[in-house]
Amino acid sequence: MKIAAGLGKNKNIIEAAADVNFEVILTESEEELSSMLLNKNVDGAVRGSLSSTKILSFLRKEYIQKIYRASLLELNNHKFLLAPVGVYEVNNLQDKLKIIELGTEFLSKLGIEPKIGIISGTRPETQGIDPKVDYFIEESVDLVEKVKNKFFIKEYLLDDAIQDNANIILAPDGISGNLIFRSLVFLGTTKSYGAVSLGMDEIFIDTSRSQTVEGYKRALELSNYLAKLKHT
C-alpha cells in the first residue's frame, strides 16, 4: 500500500512516516495530495498539518453529495466514532441521519455492530427553559424514533454514552463535537486515529494540526488498514 501525507508546520508527520512499514509519500501541497488521491496514485491519504479546508475543497469538486467527517477515538480500549467534528458540516436533522447511515456502514465493514448514542447536551426535564436547548432535545427524540427499528440507538449524556460503550456518538452540532474531541484528546487520555471521511470512495483521514508523532502514526496505520480492507 502507498499512502500520501501532508507536511505542514507540524513536522511530527516526518517521524511518524519513518516509523511505519509501508510507503508514505510526503507533500507540502494540498492540491498535490488531493490529486494523488483522486487519480489513484496512492491508496489513501492523511492530512497531516496541511489545510483541511483546502484539501476538502479539492475533494468536494469530485462529489455531488456531501462529505462528512467522523473521528475514530479510543478510550479505555473502547473505539468509537465521534461526529460531527467539522464546525460547519451538520446543519439539520437530515445531515445527522446521513452521518448515522454512513457511520453504521463504516462500522459494519469493520465487522462491528453499531450502537448509537445521541447527545442532546442536557436532561429532558430541562425542556422549556431555553429554545435552543428545546431544539436539541426534540431533535434527539426525532433521531431515536427514525432509527430505532434499524439499529440500537439511545439518547445519552456524553459520559453515559462512553460508559455504555456506544460506538457512534453524535454531538448536538459541529462546534460542540469539535470541543468534545479536543477535550477528550488534548486534555484527557483519549487516543485519536484521525477523522475518517464518510461519503466518498477514496480513503482520506483528517488529522489535527496539533497531533503528536504517535497520533499521526495511528492515522497513517488506519489509512493503510482501510486501504487493505478495500482491496480484499
Predicted region positions:
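Anion-binding alpha/beta catalytic cores of soluble intermediary-metabolism enzymes, centered on
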Residues: 1-162, 167, 171-232
